[in-house]
């Protein structure tokens, strides 16, 4: 067991709070978080911080309300702000965790806290690694918990992560009876599996934490050795060995945490990219991958409501700037080779929008889907996403993409009534 002074002596050199003045402490009332609260309260002047308390009452035990009342009383006595939230909905480990961190984030944003501090220690780290091994997690997810990571408008800090539970002083706290319920995997790991494994190897927890550290260093080294590779460039990607491609794609997918592909889905995606089959491929959760001749990109499908928000209406004889272009009905006085003019056979308002599923344009004797037009003309992903569709009287009259404009073919008896002029806005 260590004293708070000994803990402080180790923590101060890590400068966790160097860039923070107001920090929010997640306090459940258990022994770990109560130790964290007392430690930061005692050393807040030396750390040059001011603290606040965030507590979530999960309403799952009869003692929950008395624990909340105690924390409120403690905070009032020590003149510390406290924020409390009551969990609502169907309880599960994940639902409770999501609720807690959404609450912590909202408090940080509303009250200008730049850091959230939690009491995770090395035993929690080992539990997390063992749980992920049991669940069959990927190698990169065996890196465990980080001592500092981005969160909300600042950082999530875990200053106790290098200490074990037995290092923390004895202190008044509440015992959570649900920690003994074996219906939760973490409780089975903590109360059943780890004690048995420690009988085989008393340093098993240290071994798991060393595994997490080395795994983290391994993936950091991989990033440093491959940071010159543009993963989404098909030429560069396919020049790599199959093993490097595997981990490059894994690394790229880390940018889409809610996509969460199964191993079979990941393997299928890798095969599609390796064979460079051009086109759109649906993945899951509204995500798809688009592959063209030169590159690939994963994008979340934009809901129709979002597409509607992006629409603009251009009335006759008015001006409108939309994205990188200015639309008007008056030509420039000087001849400008860059100005595009579009003949209009109606004076109705013109809707400017993004491409939507099923869009097509008439070229006279035949019509063509916009999607097929983009594929045939080999436009890049970025060009397709930035394309502007002009719609008048429920017909697409032009498609503006890249440096090209495609016009609807006029009917034989159409009479031109006006012209629409399009100028690219200068960026400076």
UniProtKB/Swiss-Prot annotation:
Reaction catalysed by this enzyme: cytidine(34) in tRNA(Ile2) + L-lysine + ATP = lysidine(34) in tRNA(Ile2) + AMP + diphosphate + H(+)
Family annotation (InterPro entries): Lysidine-tRNA-synth_C (IPR012796), Rossmann-like_a/b/a_fold (IPR014729), TilS/TtcA_N (IPR011063), tRNA_Ile_lys_synt (IPR012094), tRNA_Ile_lys_synt_N (IPR012795)
Ranges in a coiled coil: none
Disulfide pattern: none
GO biological process entries: tRNA modification
Keywords linked to the UniProt accession: ATP-binding, Cytoplasm, Ligase, Nucleotide-binding, tRNA processing
GO molecular function: ATP binding; tRNA(Ile)-lysidine synthase activity
One GO cellular component term: cytoplasm
Cellular compartments annotated: Cytoplasm
Keyword Ligase (UniProt): yes
CDD domains with a match to the protein in the record: TilS_N
Domain of life: Bacteria
Top EC group: ligase
NCBIfam families: lysidine_TilS_C, lysidine_TilS_N
Job description of the protein: Ligates lysine onto the cytidine present at position 34 of the AUA codon-specific tRNA(Ile) that contains the anticodon CAU, in an ATP-dependent manner. Cytidine is converted to lysidine, thus changing the amino acid specificity of the tRNA from methionine to isoleucine.
Family indicated by similarity: Belongs to the tRNA(Ile)-lysidine synthase family.
Domain remark from Swiss-Prot or TrEMBL: The N-terminal region contains the highly conserved SGGXDS motif, predicted to be a P-loop motif involved in ATP binding.
The protein, known as: tRNA(Ile)-lysidine synthase
Originating species: Streptococcus pyogenes serotype M3 (strain ATCC BAA-595 / MGAS315)
Taxonomic lineage: Bacteria, Bacillati, Bacillota, Bacilli, Lactobacillales
